[in-house]
C-alpha cells in the first residue's frame, strides 16, 4: 500500500522527531553532532524554514520548526535525512538505514502550548540524565540561546520567551504535560486548546489522531 502524503501547511509550528533505526545510536562523537548541524544549516539555505528549538540526542532528535510554504517541511526533512544517510554511510563504509523511517510531526498552537513543547525539547538531555542543567547540553538550543556558536541556526519564536526561560526549562514538567506531549508524538495529534485541535485536525486530515486507541466498546444487548 502506498504511503499517504503528509499534509503540512505554511506558518504552522511543528514538533518533529526521528530516531535511529532500531533506536540505535546515530551520533557517536562531537563531530557527528556538528556534521548533522552543518546539514541543518545547508537545508535551511535550500528550503526556507524557521528553527525555533532543537535537541540532538545520541539516538534521536527533536526539532520545533515553522515551514514557510505548503509541503516545505517534507522537502526540508527529505533532503536533510537522505543527505545525512549518504554521508554517514560513506564515512563509515557501511550501507543501509540510519533512521527508523519517516519522521513524525505534530502541529502546535501558537500560544502557551508552543512554550510547553519548546521546554519539552530543550530539557530533553536533562530529563535523560545526560547533564545537570539543560544549558550545558551543547547539542540543544538552550545552550545556543545562551551564546553557543550554533545560535545562528535559530529564529526567534512568534511569542516572546519569559525572562526566566532557562529556569523554566530546568524545572520539571508535570506528568499531565508529559503524557499529552508523548501522545501527540506517537499519534501526530495537534497540540493546543480543544477547539483549535479539532479544527486543525479537520483542516489537515488528522481526525484519526483524535480517536481513542483500541476497539470501540461493545453496545449492551437489547
Language model features with spans:
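Short Pro-Cys-Gly-centered "Cys-loop" motif that presents a nucleophilic cysteine in a tight turn
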Residues: 1-58, 66-222
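Conserved metal-phosphate-binding beta-hairpin within the catalytic cores
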Residues: 63
Amino acid at each position: 500500500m502506498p504511503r499517504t502524503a503528509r499534509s503540512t501547511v505554511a506558518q504552522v509550528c511543528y514538533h518533529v522527531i526521528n530516531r535511529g533505526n532500531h533506536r540505535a545510536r546515530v551520533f557517536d562523537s562531537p563531530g557527528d553532532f556538528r556534521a548533522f548541524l552543518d546539514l541543518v544549516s545547508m537545508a535551511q539555505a535550500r528550503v526556507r524554514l524557521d528553527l525555533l528549538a532543537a535537541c540532538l540526542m545520541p539516538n534521536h532528535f527533536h526539532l520545533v520548526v515553522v515551514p514557510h510554504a505548503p509541503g516545505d517541511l517534507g522537502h526540508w526533512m527529505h533532503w536533510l535525512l537522505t543527505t545525512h544517510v549518504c554521508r554517514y554511510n560513506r564515512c563509515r563504509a557501511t550501507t543501509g538505514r540510519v533512521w527508523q523511517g519517516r519522521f513524525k510531526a505534530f502541529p502546535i498552537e501558537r500560544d502557551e502550548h508552543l512554550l510547553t513543547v519548546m521546554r519539552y525539547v530543550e530539557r530533553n538531555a536533562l530529563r535523560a540524565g545526560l547533564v545537570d542543567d539543560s544549558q550545558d547540553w551543547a547539542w540543544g538550543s538552550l545552550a545556543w540561546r545562551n551564546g553557543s556558536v550554533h545560535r545562528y541556526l535559530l529564529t526567534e519564536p512568534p511569542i516572546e520567551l519569559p525572562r526566566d526561560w532557562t529556569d523554566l526549562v530546568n524545572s520539571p514538567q508535570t506528568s499531565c504535560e508529559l503524557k499529552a506531549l508523548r501522545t501527540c508524538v506517537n499519534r501526530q495529534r495537534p497540540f493546543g486548546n480543544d477547539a483549535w485541535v479539532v479544527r486543525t485536525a479537520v483542516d489537515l486530515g488528522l481526525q484519526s489522531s483524535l480517536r481513542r486507541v483500541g476497539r470501540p466498546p461493545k453496545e449492551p444487548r437489547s
